[in-house]
Amino acid sequence: MDETIATGLRLPSGLVALQDGRFALVEMDTSRRCLKLFDTSGAHQEICRIGGSPTGIAIDGDGCFWVADGPENSLVRLSPQGRVLQVIEGSADGPFLHPNALAFGPDGLLYMTDSGIRLDDLLEGGRIHPDFFKAAYNGCVYQIDPADGRVIRVLAAGLLFASGIAFDANGLLYYSETLTGKVHRQIIGGRQELFVQSMTSPAINMLRGPSGLAFDRSGVLYCAMYGLGEISLVDTEGRMAGHIRTNGTRPGSIAFTIDGKHLLVSEQENGVVEKITAPRPGLPLHMPTIS
């Protein structure tokens, strides 16, 4: 069953389930740029106005929020009350361009995708530039020490709009490359490999492709297909195993509820969060204690 549990949102993006059953979500639109908490009834509370173009979110074991693409394209750590605790602006190689999605690993470190292009270079008059595919992307995947607030290393570079990121039950890292339709898999510190090609052709004329990622407990990967109006299911061998249609065409981020029974989807065409009954229970996220 698919139901809408939050409406009136403006470019809803990253979302994450909390231990008490609520979920947190960020809105990218310039009129919002905020972090909100939602309960199961859809009632919400705005925690803070972050600034920037908040895109991704993760929560640690201290209950603090990590938000990708805060002011000046930064990664920001916020207290449960929304107070800024830490700001990370880049690596030794230079500043971040457009931080996108976040996931804590089994090692307690934080992993982040950077789309590889500044939003100002991607947009024209508030809309996607018609020549977006020809832009000079350098999408990256970063390994970050959250305690020290520094980038440890770059795990991947040169990606065409790096987007979603997730770990499977075996600790392997997965991340999506939206414009090519690829989802990559990687042992931390090892070589990148193609896990699945989710589209038959690259996104040349319309921004579309794999975005947010999440795993269920059986190892199936759930991949939000932005611009295509569906969640693709991929089995452990990298084969397409099914599709779940969304009500809108632009699903971006996905997350399982804390009990694992439902999938939450932020959908930008209608400005909503959709709640979908999960075929199988979701895999719990890593939430390490930092302080």
What are these model-predicted stretches?
Residues 181-182, 197-236:
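Loop/turn-rich, solvent-exposed surfaces of beta-rich toroidal or solenoidal domains
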Residues 38-43, 79-83, 145-149, 187-191, ...:
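Short loop/turn segments that connect beta-strands within beta-propeller blades
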Residues 25-44:
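Beta-propeller domains
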Residues 33-36, 74-76, 139-142, 182-184, ...:
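A short loop-to-beta-strand structural motif that recurs across blades of beta-propeller domains
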Residues 28-30, 70, 115-117, 178-179, ...:
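Short loop/turn segments immediately following the C-termini of beta-strands
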